[in-house]
Amino acid sequence: MMALGEPYYSSKPDKDFNFGSTMARRQMTPTMVTKLPKFVRNSPQAYDWIVRGLIFPTTGKTYFQRVVVITGGLEDGTYGSYAFNGSEWVEIYPIEHLNLMSSLKLIHKANALQERLRLSQEEKATLALDVQFLQHENVRLKELIPKPEPRKIQMKWIIVGAVLTFLSLIPGGYAQSQTNNTIFTDMIAACKYSTETLTENLDLRIKLALANITINDKLDAVRQILNFAFVPRAHWLRTVFYYIHYYEMWNIFMFVLAIGTVMRSARPGTDLITLATSHLSGFRMAVLPTIPFHTTMTLWVMNTLMVCYYFDNLLAITMAILAPILGIIFLCFMEDSNYVSQIRGLIATAVLIAGGHACLTLTGTTTSLFVVILTCRFIRMATVFIGTRFEIRDANGKVVATVPTRIKNVAFDFFQKLKQSGVRVGVNDFVVIKPGALCIIDTPEGKGTGFFSGNDIVTAAHVVGNNTFVSVCYEGLVYEAKVRYMPEKDIAFITCPGDLHPTARLKLSKNPDYSCVTVMAYVNEDLVVSTATAMVHGNTLSYAVRTQDGMSGAPVCDKYGRVLAVHQTNTGYTGGAVIIDPADFHPVKAPSQVELLKEEIERLKAQLNSAAENPVTVVTQQPIVTLEQKSVSDSDVVDLVRTAMEREMKVLRDEINGILAPFLQKKKGKTKHGRGRVRRNLRKGVKLLTEEEYRELLEKGLDRETFLDLIDRIIGERSGYPDYDDEDYYDEDDDGWGMVGDDVEFDYTEVINFDQAKPTPAPRTTKPKPCPEPKIEAQPLDLSQKKEKQPEHEQQVAKPTKPQKIEPQPYSQTYGKAPIWESYDFDWDEDDAKFILPAPHRLTKADEIVLGSKIVKLRTIIETAIKTQNYSALPEAVFELDKAAYEAGLEGFLQRVKSKNKAPKNYKGPQKTKGPKTTTH
């Protein structure tokens, strides 16, 4: 016997986890360690010590020799198992170790995060280097930018400005000639002014006393106010007005514009020339409101016409009137926007020249034209003020000013604010919040808020989406959690992980009060709290809360901190929530079809009993309606099925109880509820419906297979099947290797056929054949069994009642008759292809282990045949599968279909054979 060494561990995590068998680790040799597959570095592996015959086709004594099997995660991201055949590691079907798979998943996630961290650090370093390069480049480019030089004003424009200033200082028409005044003339003027003032005051007081004030008196009063008659004669304002009286308003305005143009204008030449031509032509103030309508070309046209007006006014008027007409004709080649701008400037020039000449001729000044143009501009601006404010942008589109369209009520603004604020009449209550009961739900689609309630984490259903597992972030740690249940409402219940222990949990409100609600949520990993008054709308709430992304799924609580609803709506201002009830936490288990049928049978029995007690004597002859004349609904078909089931239920109960008596006994160690148990002849001798009733059901639309499946389900429930099919149990990875574990009993006498050449067994001593017992029980499948010798008294009592079968092949036990090719050589169609193989979750463990590869091959052939509608290869494939099943001691699939759907009346099912036991767990 070889001496065993110390257990082998590939890394410290492997030693810490220590998955699998220690004995298998002791069997590791340096050669085996050298040839190990490329598992993930610093990851655990599971070691199993399994009988060689369960893995490799083996005969003789080597069948019971054990080999080392290593299971772990490979560097390419796959999960696999490898067995050592003496010279090298051979990949076999993966053995499931749940703890190992969970550990590998966490290690893979940690490695992925480390890789992401490494890439992020590299990217950060690269970006930091790029920032440094950009900073250096920025400094270099700043040095290349020419520094702005101080603005230089050309001397010619200074001269033009000085000329305009000189022109503006020339006295206007109000200048008076200087007279020689003496003391006597001043006294006479003062006495005259006093006498006139006294007379005017007396007349005004008399009119006021008699209430005889006319409109002319009111106009004279306004005129005196405008002439500053209320200012005393010795006041300093009189002195200022005395000197300003020598100059007109245009002179002062032109002086200010000339100084400002020389100092700040970007185009001083054009602006100064425009001021000069306005002054020389006499249009003066009337020119300024028309400047926004002009382009560069039309502005020079206006200046030219004003200079021409100074020399020949009639020629200037004629050219101004013809300018728009000529512009419409000769400028039509321009773009629409430029074309309209040019024509608008020419029209403004014509209006200015013609209107200015008319005003100068009639009134001697252009003030009236200035007022008219200014009024038109105000009207134009008022018509386009639609919104509450308008923005003024520069040439680059940047907003430089914002002007409100309505004047702010400055005088009464204080009273309005006082009215809106009101006077405090109460005190707000405190509300209870529990930040420790909140968490963040993270999914690939986004983030949301969740809260702990009971053993669940509650959030909004649209946060979870179609994900089965989500990430729960709580106090800086991330946990993986499974979505337990989602009702019809926008609510999702997530199972709280076992290693997550929240510091607080929220309870549901027994007496909901929606007058004041509190919303707690995480926004950008910051806790936000808001209170508002809610309104109830059926099963939803609405409240005025400024909602942000990430608040979905947050709890809506009352002032005591009890949950009322789950936040779900995000409109930016108005928040909404769906009310949560205690009934929402647990799914309503829908009654099974069998229970519904039983209830309906009891109801029909009660109706029959009541009908028997009160028989109806009057019978109305109804006309016979044929099937073509009658419209049959689904409810009529269901009622017919229920009536038939009521009549046959009593017979089914008695016979099923008699047949399934052995199966109803609970055996020690059986925890799978009879899953995979072989059941035969459960409907033997039972006549469910008459031929006429059966045909009537088919004509009314009921499928024969549906009806038989319903009966099979009832039988399966009574014989130990669960009420439902556990879809999670029959996953695509469950290929029979799930039984390999620490709590599984192995039968090392089992031989698995992998379609390899059968070896010739060693010579054996002939043993007496066991006689069949009077009562035969169905036993689990085993391909080989060491039969024990029965006592002599039992052999004498048991007498064979049937002829003995032919001796089976070595290490094999057949089932029924061998398949014949003539039984498979017929025209196959799509229905035959679909129903030849059962569903994957209805296959037994023996089918999956022995015939797994052939079943997968046949399914591929069936799918190809259905797609191409070519079923020529199907008979041979089914024949090969049934032949392999026969050699392995299993029932053929064609025989199963016949025994289920097409058995003759005298058909007694497949022949019973005793097989060795196998232990499944």
Swiss-Prot record:
SUPFAM superfamilies: Trypsin-like serine proteases
Keyword Hydrolase listed: yes
Keyword presence, Lyase: no
A Gene Ontology cellular-component term: host cell membrane
Catalytic activity annotation: RNA(n) + a ribonucleoside 5'-triphosphate = RNA(n+1) + diphosphate
Transmembrane regions: 240-260, 287-307, 314-334, 345-365
Example GO biological process: viral translational frameshifting
InterPro entries noted in UniProt: Astro_1A, Astro_p19, Astro_VPg, Mamastrovirus_p20, Peptidase_S1_PA, Peptidase_S1_PA_chymotrypsin
UniProt region (Disordered), positions on chain: 753-813, 900-921
EC number: 3.4.21.-
Pfam families: Astro_1A (PF19415), Astro_p19 (PF19414), Astro_VPg (PF19416), Astrovir_pp_1 (PF12285), Trypsin_2 (PF13365)
Compositionally biased residues, Low complexity: 908-921
Active site: 462, 490, 552
Signal peptide positions (record): none
Keywords: Covalent protein-RNA linkage, Host membrane, Hydrolase, Membrane, Phosphoprotein, Protease, Serine protease, Transmembrane, Transmembrane helix, Viral RNA replication
Residues marked Cleavage (site): 176-177, 420-421, 665-666, 756-757
Posttranslational mods: Cleaved by the viral and host proteases. The protease is probably autocatalytically cleaved.
Top EC group: hydrolase
Post-translational modification O-(5'-phospho-RNA)-tyrosine, affected residues: 694
Ranges of biased composition (kind: Basic and acidic residues): 784-796
Molecular function GO labels: 5'-3' RNA polymerase activity; serine-type endopeptidase activity; serine-type exopeptidase activity
Entry similarity comment: Belongs to the astroviridae polyprotein 1A family.
This protein's name: Non-structural polyprotein 1A
Originating species: Human astrovirus-8 (HAstV-8)
